[in-house]
């Protein structure tokens, strides 16, 4: 741990030596909301979940299958779509994209690479939590972040739509 701390301190010192202090920096902000569909369980999944959980309360669920079935029942009651808030701040030439969920690293990197003006970094879990928001190709791989439960409820094409909205916000900034 001492070696890591030393390496980190040396890197911070190296970077801060090149910083130029200014007391005047431009601040800008843009925000929007977009509507995304909720991935709801099928009627057959809801029927199977009800049968599995018949007569049992939430404190009686013991297996992952039972917990997942309960989540299917809860998700079935969600609205068909949700309003997703997005914000971007600009501090000088630094842009801060605020995602209301947990994005994958590749998603943040793609938005950074598409940024035409200045530097960009991403903040997840800002202004809400709409679960994991995996890119479309991750859904085919089937990891837990993609399971259609309350922790990953947005449509499979959410990331391209969010990227597009963020790019529009970036271009709205003066």
Where are these regions (language model features)?
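Non-catalytic substrate/cofactor recognition surfaces at enzyme active-site rims
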Residues: 1-174
